[in-house]
Every structure is written in C-alpha cells, then in structure tokens.
C-alpha cells in the first residue's frame, strides 16, 4: 500500500492536502486536490465499479484530469500538460475516499 498523509491547510478556506511519501505520485495528489472537491462521489464510484468487479475497466473525465481504470492500476492524466502517473487502483480509491471524507467535514460546518 502507498504511504501518504492528509493535512488540512489554509485558515480562511481550509482544504485537505494529500502528500504521498513517494514523489512519483505527486500528480495523484494534485488530481485529488483539483478534482475530488467537485467530483468526489463520481471518482469513488468509478474506482469502486472496477475494484468490485462490476466492470473490467473504467474511466473518469474531470475538468483537468482523466482516469483510465483497471483492476490493478489506474493511469491519471493531466489533460492540459499531458503528464501521467500510474497508481494502484485500490490505493487511489482509499486515498480518494479519505480525501472526500475530510473535504466533506470541512464543508458541512
């Protein structure tokens, strides 16, 4: 499993920020910050359908990022810069669920 932490940053408009120990996953952290705030449930649902075996593959397209999901790995693509990152699908799902939970706590106050 991937090691990461979620910290709340900012005083006026606090946001959860994900930091992965391995810098190869920096794009995954940027994806969560950029897309999960608006599309948390959709991202988690797309990942869950593949993890649960309901679909063999899946996809998600947000404002800046897109996902190509397989049971083992998910490719995160920054559609503007063309940068890509491959991450374990289950690890991304777990991080997205935790990020979404933290974001909802902040916005429900």
PLM feature spans:
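Short, low-complexity, polar/charged sequence segments that are solvent-exposed and flexible
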Residues: 36-40, 94-97, 106
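Short, Lys/Arg-rich amphipathic alpha-helical interaction segments
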Residues: 101-109
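Surface-exposed beta-strand edges and their flanking turn/coil or helix-capping segments
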Residues: 19, 30-33, 82, 89-91, ...
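Amphipathic protein-protein interaction modules
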Residues: 45-97
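The feature represents the first ordered module of a protein
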Residues: 1-60
């Amino acid at each position: 499993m991937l090691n990461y932490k979620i910290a709340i940053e900012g005083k006026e408009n606090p946001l959860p920020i994900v930091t992965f120990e391995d810098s190869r996953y920096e794009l995954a952290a940027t994806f969560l910050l950029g897309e999960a705030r608006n599309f948390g449930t959709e991202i988690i649902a797309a990942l869950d359908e593949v993890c649960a075996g309901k679909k063999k593959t899946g996809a998600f397209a947000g404002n800046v990022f897109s996902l190509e999901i397989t049971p083992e790995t998910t490719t995160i693509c920054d559609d503007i810069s063309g940068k890509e990152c491959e991450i374990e699908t289950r690890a991304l799902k777990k991080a997205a669920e935790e990020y979404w939970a933290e974001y909802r706590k902040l916005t429900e106050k």
